[in-house]
């Protein structure tokens, strides 16, 4: 449910154990009337050490979002605010005011392996954690562009050394003939 005019940020990170994690975080002001958080976990097969999804897994996620999640969120008045991809699962974060069981009913037929979590979160604390992660990433990017150490001083050029080895042949003036 990434519509026109929405601003999304991608943050790539690593967990403490070195496992790569990717976040997509939507930029929006919390809507306090949407006081429940709902998270969908969609597992995917992992085949390499990164434990990140392959192309088929991304296509499955896209199909789920377009054909199942977006219509359910629109019908029930929920807002998708972020996602996390790590260690064999996609996690989709959303806020709403409707009964979360209605979302479970609409989404569970897509795949029996889907997992669901919901909680009362009127202060949008989970979203605040995602935004804090985004701000940390922004600060790190700025840090990379403006290093903390002073630039190295330019050294004076070393004096030219005399060449050793075979000397270069001298240029000769062309000979002219006398008439």
What is the predicted role of each segment?
Residues 1-67, 74-81, 100-101, 129-152:
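Charge-rich, low-complexity segments
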Residues 1-8, 98-179:
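Acidic, proline/glycine-rich low-complexity IDRs
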Residues 57, 61, 69, 80, ...:
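Residue-level signal for functionally critical sites in structured catalytic/ligand-binding pockets
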Residues 63-113:
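Amphipathic protein-protein interaction modules
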Residues 41, 95, 117:
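Residues in well-ordered beta-strands of folded domains
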Residues 51-54, 68, 94, 164, ...:
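Aromatic-enriched hydrophobic runs in primary sequence
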